[in-house]
A protein has these predicted regions:
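Hinge/lid segment of periplasmic solute-binding proteins
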Residues: 105-163, 213-214, 305-306
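Short, solvent-exposed loop/beta-turn-alpha elements that line the ligand-binding surface or hinge
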Residues: 121-135, 221-249, 299, 310-319, ...
Length: 445
């Protein structure tokens, strides 16, 4: 997954070093740190939006209440901060016992290779997680000898994610534009909006990954689920090439939008998070991003959510997505009691009870709701749940492109501004992605 959210409790680098130094001094002074106790769990998560954080705090309190004597020592970090610090912290012995970790070669794959994560297959059997989530979803947390999608399972996620098309019903209605049913209709709608002086798309490319999601979502909407094998092979490191006509055409279209005035003015200087807030305030007709923004988007009742409309001839279009960062147990869980407590914690985080709590807060749970659950669903979440059911039924849940290599996210982030500004061609953009991927395949051999 490639999303970034605003921080609520992030230590600057100098404070992190100071905290580590103080922790080391405490160990020397007292011989045994609190983090070493089996009943004291250091947990890192990426739930840094206010609504998400409130859910995690509630679930943590409930877990502590059900396990007297257990204390959750929580640290919340943004996606990008997690990528920068997690592997180093666990390697140094200063990290969490339980953590969220991004699937894919750059994070989970690298940590598994270095022995920094523990397999959770025993807990899958013990708690029946394979009854709560499909095997195709759990496969996104499997690694074996550098191979993605096979072997032992190293995590499980609590939230489902879909990248789709947010739209502002009022703006579209005032402009006399109907919701598009096909990709061709979407293109026509964008032209109508632009002619009326309305920014067709909200966009922010200064920080975060809105452009990446836009390119990936458009490309995968043009892939029928019956033809997904090529994409699966790319993501799971089995081979192939990013240098395809479909990827080039998607990059070309997004570049044309950027150069042709289809994006909100000044998008180059706006971060992805700020672009979302502008969209919520009523700026822009459409925005392509993921369900992780449901909690914020629900504050504007005019905002709806739908799949990227498929082009004619595609009956089961794919959607970028899958699940949020996985809950995992690190190698810092040294003892069996600590590992078992970590397993119990993760079980609660992916339970039907937790799923209902997330749903009540407006977020899309990866675990199916219990038959007798009666959450208060927002219109956005209702749309998301129906999309989730359809995508899973059609085997059309796609992938985040950055999962395909350890360095792909950086490669895409470095080159997307160049693509949008017209400083590189769509062909060069895709070629850069493919060179990154081919180098990764070569290094794996």
């Amino acid at each position: 997954m490639t999303r970034t959210v605003k921080s609520i409790s992030i230590l600057p680098a100098y404070r992190l070093k100071a905290a580590v130094a103080l922790a080391g001094a405490a160990l020397l002074s007292f011989g045994l740190s609190a983090a070493a106790r089996a009943d004291d769990l250091a947990v890192w998560d990426d739930q840094t939006y206010e609504g998400q954080s409130a859910v995690i705090e509630q679930l943590n309190k409930e877990f502590e209440a059900a396990h007297p004597g257990v204390m959750i020592k929580r640290t919340a970090r943004t996606f990008d901060d997690m990528k920068l610090t997690l592997k180093l912290a666990v390697s140094a012995g200063d990290g969490p016992v339980i953590t969220k970790v991004n699937q894919g070669a750059g994070d989970m794959g690298a940590m598994v290779k270095e022995g920094l994560l523990l397999p959770v297959d025993d807990y899958i059997k013990q708690y029946g997680w394979d009854k709560l989530q499909s095997d195709s979803v759990l496969a996104r947390d499997r690694w074996e000898d550098g191979k993605f999608g096979v072997g032992k399972t190293y995590g499980i996620s609590g939230l489902g994610e879909i990248v789709g098309l947010y739209y502002n019903k009022k703006i579209l209605g005032d402009a006399g534009v109907a919701l598009p049913q096909t990709f061709e209709e979407l293109l026509a709608d964008l032209d109508k909006l632009k002619e009326k002086g309305i920014a067709p798309f909200m966009m922010g490319s200064a920080k975060q990954h809105l452009a990446l999601h836009m390119i990936g979502a458009i490309d995968q909407a043009h892939i029928d689920a019956s033809n997904r094998a090529e994409l699966d092979d790319l993501i799971y490191g089995r081979g192939g090439s990013w240098n395809t006509k479909g990827n080039i055409e998607s990059a070309k279209l997004v570049q044309q939008w950027a150069q042709g005035g289809y994006f909100f003015p000044g998008f180059e200087g706006i971060s992805g998070d700020d672009a979302v807030q502008l969209f919520i305030s009523g700026q822009g007709a459409f925005l392509i991003s993921g369900t992780w923004y449901f909690g914020d988007m629900q504050h504007n009742p005019d905002i709806g959510f739908m799949a990227i409309p498929a082009p004619k001839g595609i009956s089961k279009p794919m959607s970028v997505g899958g699940v949020d960062l996985a809950w995992a147990i690190t190698s810092l869980a040294k003892t069996k009691p600590t590992q078992d407590l970590a397993g119990a914690y993760i079980d609660y985080m992916v339970s039907e009870k937790a799923a209902e709590t997330w749903a009540n807060a407006g977020y899309l749970p990866a675990t199916s709701l219990a038959a007798d659950a009666k959450p208060k669903l927002t219109p956005l979440l209702s749309s998301g749940i129906e999309m989730w059911k359809t995508l899973n039924a059609n085997d059309a849940l796609g992938h985040y492109p950055d999962w395909s290599s350890p360095t792909m996210l950086k490669t895409i982030d470095d080159n997307t501004p160049l693509l949008l500004s017209g400083n590189i061609t769509p062909e060069a953009f895709v070629d850069t992605m493919d060179k990154d991927y081919q180098a990764y395949l070569k290094d794996k051999k």
